[in-house]
Amino acid sequence: MKTRPQALGLGEPYPGRAHSLVVQIPTWADMVAFGQGKAAAQMNHGYPRSVVHPDIRSLGSTILAKIHHKTAEAAPSSSLLLFSGVKAALCCKHYILRCMQGRDQGVLEDCVRVYEVSFGSSCMCRDHHHHHHHDDAHSGSPTLYAVLYPSAAAADAHAFWQRTGPGISSRLAQHCLRLQQQGSGPRVGALPAAASTASPMGSSLPDSHPVYAELRRRIAGYAQHSADEPPMTQPVTAPDVFLYGSGMAAIYHVHQAILAWRSGMSVHAGLLYEPTLRILQTHGPGVRSYSLGTAAELDELAAHLEQERVSGSPCAVPAIWCECPSNPILQTVDLQRLRALADQHDLLVVVDDSVASFANVDLLGVADIVVSSLSKYFSGYADVMAGSAILNPRSRHHATLLNQMARTHENSLFVDDALRLERNSRDFPARMARINATTESLVQQLGPRVADPKCPLTRLLYPSRCTSRGYYEGQMRWSSSSSPGAESRPRPGYGGVFSMEFADCGCAAAFFDHLEVYKGLSFGADVCIAAAYVQMTGRQNAPGTAHETLIRFSVGLEPAEEMLLRVETALEAAGRVFLAQGSRKP
């Protein structure tokens, strides 16, 4: 490493990357403060869904001043969020209003407004209630949409922006700031009343730059290699792949498309990523949780589905959501059983494969839709946000889902981000194979420390060590050297993330503070990243979550020997605390 991670302070990004997703949260105390909402205000940079990038803040301030000057409607206490699509902006407006009116029925609709912000030669406000061609982002003259809201709704606006992930990227903000410097905007106009009251779900906007088609083809190609032989008879094609500006944006839009197909309370099995859970809880009829994902809980789920069937409930469950494996405890639920339940009761199964990546696991044998954070392993260099949704061509509901997704899709992936993603992902297979091998080596060498009574390490979590190992291995991609194209594919593995639990928080804090790697919210990068996950998310006392001492470790491209030495040095520091306290393993 050119720069020692320990030399970076709170909120400092990975050196040399203007759009880095790796932003340092260096100590255990900083992680706790972040989870309590006390650290973000001190951070000039942060993970894009947690801390607004400085260029986005600068652009937002300029646009807010323009709105105030032009319309005299923006109160001094007003704030705004920026989106690249009108549908996302209107979804944000409706969400903020719903939250505000839930607290005070006297809140008027016009207290939250959407403005069109043009860069380039044209500033005409278009009526978005009708179909129109829109290629500004590809011509270099983008149109943004600003949602203006009162300060009283700041928490609601932040929740929408953080969970649903459709806000503009830092690259798009930089592009707009350059246009501003050239005198090409911004020009501000309010949306027509018809557009402001229209449904957020409308016609699709075209992705005309060839990089989008290339990315879809590449992802579809990786999805061809199934977990079983022979290869799938109905292969994934580029139109089955939908791209988004982030993984959470993909999850949000898939959820909305499913609810348009069947509105009802969703279900999740196994531990679910916190923002995903919040989307299911707050952007629809709600969710039933089976957070442990055990056989007993799946029995309960089966009984619930049967009860709904017998009662003829008009709000039948639309989908079961899960991860493979779950973040951060690396468990895998019985996906074959979920598939059987879905077939029996005509449900969808949606699986997030971000932790394993579709280089390692094939989920199209069990899922109707696979969602992924492309910001992680597919990109691999932690400098671009993106997400995808893959529709299973063998799903009985494929035609309906494809029509719904295509009709409502709105491109939120800026072309410069797409170009970066395409370049980054060229070495995805080889990079993932290397990370798999390094991680398996680290886990094998650390495993015996769990049984050492003098070591405070109490549990090592990794798909190959979990009781659910068989469920994960059942989804691993076929690696036979005799299968077509096998020589160009990586050997599937167990992924690049493992987690460690300790005897107590004092030992965990000592380990974390002495661990010389990058520390922050992301994973799946070319450098190792550690996170005090439960502390960072502020979920210490929530049922069904991970242990409060858990530290998630994402392996990068550094040599295994170097990383093992760093981990062992940190374990020695934790061991000193453990022995000084006279602690014992639980």
Curated annotation (Swiss-Prot):
Gene that this sequence comes from: ungC
Assigned keywords, A-Z: Isomerase, Pyridoxal phosphate
EC code(s) of this entry: 5.1.1.1
Tree of life domain: Eukaryota
GO molecular function: cystathionine gamma-synthase activity; isomerase activity; pyridoxal phosphate binding
Gene Ontology terms: biological process: transsulfuration
Catalytic activity: L-alanine = D-alanine
Any Pfam family: Cys_Met_Meta_PP
Name of the protein this chain belongs to: Alanine racemase ungC
Pathway connected to this protein: Secondary metabolite biosynthesis
PANTHER family: CYSTATHIONINE GAMMA-SYNTHASE-RELATED, PTHR42699
Biased composition (Polar residues): 196-206
Cofactors required: pyridoxal 5'-phosphate
Organism of origin: Aspergillus violaceofuscus (strain CBS 115571)
Class of enzymatic activity (EC top level): isomerase
